[in-house]
Curated annotation (Swiss-Prot):
Pathway involvement of the protein, from the record: Cofactor biosynthesis; coenzyme A biosynthesis; CoA from (R)-pantothenate: step 1/5
Protein name, as recorded: Pantothenate kinase
Pfam families: PRK
Residues the entry annotates as binding ATP: G91, S92, V93, A94, V95, G96, K97, S98
Reactions catalysed, as given in the entry: (R)-pantothenate + ATP = (R)-4'-phosphopantothenate + ADP + H(+)
EC number, UniProt record: 2.7.1.33
Keyword set, alphabetical order: ATP-binding, Coenzyme A biosynthesis, Cytoplasm, Kinase, Nucleotide-binding, Transferase
Entry's localization field: Cytoplasm
GO cellular component, one term: cytoplasm
Family: Belongs to the prokaryotic pantothenate kinase family.
Molecular-function annotations in GO: ATP binding; pantothenate kinase activity
Origin species: Streptococcus suis (strain 98HAH33)
Amino acid sequence: MKNEFLNFEQIDRATWQQLHRKTTIPLSQSELNSIKSFNDRIQLHEVSDIYLPLVNLIHIYRKARKDLNFTKSLFLQKTIKPQPFIIGVSGSVAVGKSTTSRLLQILIARTFKYAKVELVTTDGFLQPYAVLEERQLLNKKGFPESYDMEKLIDFLDKIKNGYDCQIPVYSHEIYDIIPNKTQEIKSPDFLIVEGINVFQNPQNQRLYVSDYFDLSIYVDADVEHIETWYLERFQKLLTLAKNDPNNYYHRFTQMTYPEILSIAQNTWKNINLANLEKFIEPTRNRADIILHKAENHEIDKIYLKK
């Protein structure tokens, strides 16, 4: 693991929080609670200590991108039209990517006045349940072959070139793409793309999703902690599904606790852990920034690519 981080500056929490002058946190604890994943934990001091310095760094990266585009336009002797600043957020299932992404969306929108900040998840680019079932890929859901990567790359290419797009929407409740529902993305100043697969090797070996990113962030944690968080999340999903027969997880609520635990542990080991070890974690060093979370969900180390 040490060799993997040779090209990164390791910064501890105490040092990182000093890299941004103390300002008023631009959201309340109730707002924070409303955007966090239901099995995640985050307090306002995490916003102040970790995320405000991170937004400051995003400002630096964005300015560098704009300066480069301006210089390129002088070199090419033509105008380069404005492009959205695209941020990729990756990491394991249950590690807290969604909380990080939603929080960044709010903080960026409130830091860059008048900026339009959109967030999409790659869940919307999963193949529909029926397609996965037909191809016998239900046990590979979340693996590279379960996504329509061409559609994802086509979306990013269109957005980068100034086109409006409509993309599918995924529901964890029905465990499938929602029929006849789309998310419209129109001329964002910032676009956050969150998903377990955003740094992975392309199927055609020529074009990476991450080729479109101006900044990439990997949310990391020790495997044993992620497993605990996953099992907690599975149990909470069942609690939410208890009175909803249409919820995918409702079928598990009729089982005994040992049966439920066995299913959750097997799903973690055979699907999520296997996917993490083979496809997700090996892409970690492609990130510009790695946020490492401790057992209490707080970020204790930050790795910044040199």
